[in-house]
Amino acid sequence: MINHAINFILISLLIFTPIAFASMDFWAFSLMELGILFMIILWAIQFGLVALKRRSLTSEPKTPNSELRIPNSQLRSPGLILLALFLCLIIFQMIPLPSGVVKVLSPKNYELRNFLVTGSPAPSSLLVPGSSSRPSALGLDSSSQPSAGTFFLSLVPFATQVEFFKWLTLIGFFLFLQVWSFPENRGRTLNRLILVIFLVGVFESLYGMFESFSGHHQALNIKLDDSSVAGTFISRNYFAGYLLMVIPLSIGYLLSRKENQILRFKGWRHWLTSLHGKSLLVGFGVVVMILSLLFSASRMGIASLLFSCGLISLLLRSLRGGKKVSRIPVLILVLALLWAAWIGLDAVISRFFTSSDDFKSRWEVWVDTVRMVKDFPLFGSGLGTFTLVFPMYRSFHITGVTNHAENDFLQLTSDVGLVGIGLLLILFIAFFYKAVEGIRSLSEGDPKRYVGIGGLVGIVALMLHSLVEANVQIPANAFLFAFIFAVVLRLPDVTHQRN
């Protein structure tokens, strides 16, 4: 019963997080955090009840579904230590430290804090022309100061606190998926969850194309300034980042269904005559998602899509028959390109050749962000403080606010420093290597291999896209990223249900 409740909440979050404007508003990501918290609490209750039940028995028979067993989990690996160290680093940014310690660990932080306390002139290197030297103009507030003689490593502790709870929740969600015992048959439950992700991706694609081609240009009740396809994500680039994970995962799911039918029918003629309509619908849905990503006109999104389709075709080539490439991903991509060409790709193509100004603006943001990293090299300016601290370093004039550095890795480095980004990179490499080893441990022709390869290719595509966009900063994309990564790590533990 509890497992089914957890499953219901998880499915609800997989649907809610992208549709609620990518969960970027405070109310949306707060509901996401509450949903994750409820799942963890329910799992803890279930774990406790099973433990009490087993203790009450005079003899301790083995539990058939092994509810007390911790699966092949990262809880027994160095990954947990690295995750804990990263969270401790963020907590370290939020606790008051002696000013002398801050002066050693972050000299520029000490200089700014000293300016707030003493009222001395602001460092001239941080003032852009026309700016004020008041604390509020720098994105800082003297109310964030702790008691006399102590400073925070984070320039804006409240912003760091908000972002810390986001990361804590998502890390908790990732670890929860490592230990949760799927209800009923694990393979069937996993297929159901992947199908939900696929359907949400198709809905976002169809809705986005309807709004774009009809001329409404809306995301639910919000009017969009851009005519590109964006679904309910507001930004085409965030929308592209989401689909970059969904499309390879869906291709892997499609091929896993195909493999099931091959294993069952033993022969391509028998399989072809018995091809299930659902497989054709899944293939059509993938074509629709690729089509919508093309019409999003996200340049790096399209480049990452082409890369991911090529990569998944190469990785699947050796699974059967020794082919040089897997034909199905190539066929799906070609069909989507032909359909897009029939509709008209003039606007998309022209955008690729008018990118100089856009790249120039990104380059300016990157250069100024590097200046931030140089001033806060070890521990950063504080997780979640980029929007407030960047105006001190901005060397160009814009209307509005720069919310992201247009590069996840660079922004995280400015927020958590070289120490924090180093921990995250080591953690990512360790988990990615473990996921690859898990997939390689599966037997040839195991349908789970297709799902695993599709999930990993989606993760790689998102990382490539993150070189010029913000993806980890978007709650819906971060939630799906954590889900796919956790599921791929769990695949060797999942008992697959043959169709």
Positions of predicted regions on the chain:
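Short, basic, low-complexity termini and linkers enriched in Ser/Thr/Gly/Pro
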Residues: 56-80, 122-148, 499
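Aromatic-rich transmembrane-lumenal/periplasmic boundary elements in polytopic membrane proteins
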Residues: 89, 94-121, 159, 210-218, ...
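Extracytosolic (periplasmic/ER-lumenal) interhelical loops and adjacent juxtamembrane/interface segments
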Residues: 102-153, 372, 384-392
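Membrane-interface helix-loop-helix modules in multi-pass membrane proteins
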Residues: 75-80, 84-91
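Alpha-helical transmembrane segments of multi-pass inner-membrane proteins
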Residues: 2-23, 30-44, 87-97, 116-119, ...
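Canonical alpha-helical transmembrane segments
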Residues: 41-56
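TM-adjacent membrane-interface loops and short helices in multi-pass inner/ER membrane proteins
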Residues: 93, 235, 363-403, 409-412, ...
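Short glycine/proline- and charge-enriched loop/turn segments
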Residues: 222-227, 350, 390-396
